[in-house]
């Protein structure tokens, strides 16, 4: 396109000025370049924004996974603490049981030793009354010792009861911790399921957005290639049309010059024919006069022969008559010679005029042949012009097909928006049902809602991009219409065939205007529908 603009500028500088068609074409090419560059930068910015959004989503998923790992670690630590408490309680119960067993054994030993002492004392009391006081003091000592052991036994029993209460409290605490662990495990399993479902939905949405981004990039590339192809095709058509118009103008000028030359040659031919006819008339008159003179010469010859036969005796009157006849004969011979010379001159002039007439006739035939060839070439140029018209019509049909594809893409976007609104509604219901679970889950769901709204905004931006593509196609249609108008303004009909071609081109222009008006109406209807859909979506939000 830039090469075409440079070629047009060079041609304009070489010619000293740019025509209106070339200036308008240059302006249109600049506008197309600006539009393509603007759309390319806009699409690159939106692609970068979508990529950053996907990166943020992946980072959030990583943070959720790290939080889930932390909660798993906390649950493992709680399990370890519960197991340690159970081990400690079991060890304490075993120690308490061993101590009680030892106390029971010591108590049994003391009871047996007390019984033995009682028996021994009874035997000694019966056998020996002397040591009664010593035995009594010994008995009191043993009784005090027994009381001490009984007190210790009571203390140990109290301590055993305290230990048993501690064991029961530890058992209740263990049960409470086990129940709490089960509740936490259930909550973690529920949260894990929710996180897995959210992760799956997020992955599916990421895949969907990635595929949509790829499709959008493919559509952008295809649209850019199509725009470049159409632009190149329009440039080629404009260049060929301009060259054809220039050739047509040159050939029409040559045709006019040939017609003028042919008319001049025909006029010269008519003049030569008139001169030839006059010369032929003169020759005919000279021939008639020659015949008359020849008859007179014959008459004088016969008269001279008669006079030679007559006798020589003549009268003076006859001699005078004879001399007069001789003078008449000389004058007749002179006229006859003059007539011969004039006849020869006229014959040479006639020969020259016939040669010039033949050359003029050959020139006329050659010019007529060239004129027929130029008419045929003009017809071929008209056929090429019709082909260019058909090509422009095909380009319009392609633009219409592009609009239809954009409308189908718009319908797909509408379906996607309705699906997203349903998902948002379902997520609102889910958020309302699971609102009292925990603040962390509520924050995550709010983040999901924000992400869904961001996706809705992205869809709205995609709709805006489709609208801008429609405007760009409309600009392309206007450019094609302006190019056709420029072609019609640049055409200079100079012959009846050129006027017929001009009328045909004007009819084709009116038909193309009608098609473009219908196309603009269709684009406006699509625009209203897209705006209505966006308003409905914003109202649902």
Swiss-Prot record:
Which Gene Ontology terms of cellular component type are present?
centriolar satellite; centriole; centrosome; cytoplasm; spindle pole
Q: What is the lineage of its organism?
A: Eukaryota, Metazoa, Chordata, Craniata, Vertebrata
Q: Where is the composition biased (Basic and acidic residues)?
A: 307-321
Species name: Pongo abelii
GO terms of biological process kind: cell division; centriole replication; de novo centriole assembly involved in multi-ciliated epithelial cell differentiation; DNA damage checkpoint signaling; negative regulation of protein K63-linked ubiquitination; protein stabilization; signal transduction in response to DNA damage; spindle assembly
Q: What InterPro entries does the record point to?
A: Cep63/Deup1_N
> What does this protein do, in the record's words?
Required for normal spindle assembly. Plays a key role in mother-centriole-dependent centriole duplication; the function seems also to involve CEP152, CDK5RAP2 and WDR62 through a stepwise assembled complex at the centrosome that recruits CDK2 required for centriole duplication. Reported to be required for centrosomal recruitment of CEP152; however, this function has been questioned. Also recruits CDK1 to centrosomes. Plays a role in DNA damage response.
Q: Name the predominant localization.
A: cytoplasm
Q: How is it modified after translation?
A: Polyubiquitinated via 'Lys-48'-linked ubiquitin, leading to its degradation. Deubiquitinated by USP36, promoting its stabilization.
Chain intervals for the UniProt region annotation (Disordered): 294-324
Keyword Aminoacyl-tRNA synthetase included in the entry's annotation: no
What are the coiled-coil residue ranges?
22-199, 242-305, 346-485, 514-541
Keywords from the named record: Acetylation, Cell cycle, Cell division, Coiled coil, Cytoplasm, Cytoskeleton, DNA damage, Mitosis, Phosphoprotein, Ubl conjugation
Residue numbers carrying Phosphoserine? 278
Q: Which Pfam families match?
A: CEP63
Show the Gene3D superfamilies listed in the entry: 1.20.5.340
Name by which UniProt lists this protein: Centrosomal protein of 63 kDa
Subunit composition and interactions: Interacts with CEP152 and CDK1; these interactions recruit both ligands to centrosomes. Interacts with CDK2, CDK5RAP2, WDR62, CEP90, KIAA0753/moonraker and CCDC14. CEP63, CDK5RAP2, CEP152, WDR62 are proposed to form a stepwise assembled complex at the centrosome forming a ring near parental centrioles. Interacts with CCDC57; the interaction is required for their location to proximal end of centrioles. Interacts with FXR1; promoting its stabilization.
Q: Which residues carry this modification: N-acetylmethionine?
A: 1
Q: Which gene encodes it?
A: CEP63
Query: Can you tell me which family this protein belongs to?
Result: Belongs to the CEP63 family.
């Amino acid at each position: 396109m830039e090469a075409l603009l440079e070629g047009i500028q060079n041609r304009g500088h070489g010619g000293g000025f740019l025509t209106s068609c070339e200036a308008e074409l240059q302006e249109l090419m600049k506008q197309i370049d600006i539009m393509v560059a603007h759309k390319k930068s806009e699409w690159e910015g939106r692609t970068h924004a979508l990529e950053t959004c996907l990166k943020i989503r992946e980072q959030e998923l990583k943070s959720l996974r790290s939080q889930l790992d932390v909660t798993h670690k906390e649950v493992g630590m709680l399990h370890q603490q519960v197991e340690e408490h159970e081990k400690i309680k079991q060890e304490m119960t075993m120690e308490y049981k061993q101590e009680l067993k030892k106390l029971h054994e010591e108590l049994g030993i003391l009871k047996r030793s007390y019984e033995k002492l009682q028996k021994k004392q009874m035997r000694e009391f019966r056998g020996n009354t002397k040591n009664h006081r010593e035995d009594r003091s010994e008995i009191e000592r043993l009784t005090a010792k027994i009381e001490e052991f009984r007190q210790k036994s009571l203390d140990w029993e109290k301590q055993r009861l305290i230990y048993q209460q501690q064991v029961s409290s530890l058992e209740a605490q263990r049960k409470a911790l086990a129940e709490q662990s089960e509740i936490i495990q259930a909550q973690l399993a529920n949260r894990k399921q929710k996180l897995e479902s959210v992760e799956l939905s997020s992955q599916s949405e990421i895949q969907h957005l990635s595929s949509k981004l790829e499709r959008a990039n493919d559509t952008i590339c295809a649209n850019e290639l199509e725009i470049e192809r159409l632009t190149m095709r329009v440039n080629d058509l404009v260049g060929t049309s301009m060259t054809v118009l220039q050739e047509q103008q040159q050939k029409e000028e040559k045709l006019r010059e040939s017609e003028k030359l042919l008319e001049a040659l025909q006029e010269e031919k008519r003049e030569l024919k008139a001169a030839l006819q006059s010369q032929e008339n003169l020759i005919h008159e000279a021939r008639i006069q020659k015949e008359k003179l020849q008859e007179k010469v014959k008459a004088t010859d016969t008269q001279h022969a008669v006079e030679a036969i007559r006798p020589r005796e003549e009268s003076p009157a006859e001699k005078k008559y004879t001399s007069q006849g001789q003078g008449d004969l000389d004058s007749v011979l002179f006229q006859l010679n003059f007539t011969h010379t004039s006849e020869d001159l006229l014959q040479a002039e006639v020969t020259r005029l016939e040669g010039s007439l033949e050359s003029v006739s050959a020139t006329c035939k050659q010019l007529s042949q060239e004129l027929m060839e130029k008419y045929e070439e003009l017809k071929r140029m008209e056929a090429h012009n019709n082909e260019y018209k058909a090509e422009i019509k095909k380009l319009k049909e392609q633009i219409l097909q592009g609009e239809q594809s954009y409308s189908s893409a718009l319908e797909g976007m509408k379906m996607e928006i309705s699906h997203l609104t349903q998902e948002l509604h379902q997520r609102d219901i889910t958020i309302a049902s699971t609102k009292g679970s925990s603040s962390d889950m509520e924050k995550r769901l709010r983040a999901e809602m924000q992400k869904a709204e961001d996706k809705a905004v992205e869809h709205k931006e995609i709709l805006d991009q489709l609208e801008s593509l429609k405007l760009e196609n409309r600009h392309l249609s206007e450019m094609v219409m302006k190019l056709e108008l420029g072609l019609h303004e640049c055409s200079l009909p100079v012959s009846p065939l050129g006027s017929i071609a001009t009328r045909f081109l004007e009819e084709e222009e009116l038909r193309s205007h009608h098609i473009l008006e219908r196309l603009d109406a269709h684009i406006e209807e699509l625009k209203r529908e897209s705006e209505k859909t966006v308003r409905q979506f914003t109202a649902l939000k």
